């Protein structure tokens, strides 16, 4: 029997806002995809093109996520592991083996290995990194459209100087991760009031 190998990667552990997004992808060995690489090392235009190619040609793709509330409750590491579990369990075709980018695998029953810099080494992890990044970036663009004053389209929720200044000025929205230090600080300075309240 052919091994069905799923690649798993996450995006969005560092941002102050939004879900942590993971993707699991099983590529079709009969349909190799040229140009797969770590999503951080390719242009947005190429990422979007590869996203469509992966969605059309992969044997199975699933996005798993953990919400800001789950991140606050569990911590970012455990929330990321939960999101990865959701991504793999949601695959329409279940894998015989799972490769996870990073240095640890979730606690699950799948045969698996963690691969540091796996998004540069294995096509299935590269594909997962592209699916996760494009998905999360699109969500940040939607949040930007709803709240352009925060500049989410530029910083994608990461704690840049410009973002921290806007957070201090405007306060956190309900989509922020309240357990993250800069968000806690902003909330304290506002007497616990979210933006718009």
From Swiss-Prot:
Pfam families, sorted: RNase_HII
Domain (RNase H type-2): residue spans on this chain: 3-192
GO molecular function: manganese ion binding; RNA binding; RNA-DNA hybrid ribonuclease activity
Subcellular location: Cytoplasm
Catalytic activity: Endonucleolytic cleavage to 5'-phosphomonoester
Residues that, per the record, bind a divalent metal cation: 9-10, 101
PANTHER family: RIBONUCLEASE H2 SUBUNIT A, RIBONUCLEASE HII
Family: Belongs to the RNase HII family.
Name of this protein: Ribonuclease HII
GN (gene name): rnhB
């Amino acid at each position: 029997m052919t091994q069905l190998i799923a690649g798993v990667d996450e995006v969005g552990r560092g941002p102050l806002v939004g879900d942590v997004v993971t993707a699991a992808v099983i590529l079709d060995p009969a349909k190799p995809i040229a140009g797969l690489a770590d999503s951080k090392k390719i242009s947005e235009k190429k990422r979007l093109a590869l996203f469509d190619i992966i969605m059309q040609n992969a044997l199975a793709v699933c996005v798993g996520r953990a919400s800001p509330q789950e991140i606050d409750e569990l911590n970012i590491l455990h929330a990321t592991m939960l999101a990865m579990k959701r991504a793999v369990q949601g695959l329409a075709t279940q894998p015989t083996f799972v490769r996870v980018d990073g240095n640890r695998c979730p606690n699950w029953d799948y045969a698996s290995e963690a691969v540091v810099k796996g998004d540069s080494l294995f096509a299935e992890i590269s594909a997962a990194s592209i699916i996760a990044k494009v998905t999360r970036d699109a969500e940040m663009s939607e949040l930007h459209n709803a709240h352009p004053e925060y500049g989410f389209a530029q910083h994608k929720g990461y704690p840049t100087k410009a973002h921290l200044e806007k957070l201090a000025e405007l306060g956190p929205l309900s989509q922020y991760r309240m357990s993250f230090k800069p968000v806690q600080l902003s909330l304290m300075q506002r007497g616990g009031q979210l933006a718009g309240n």
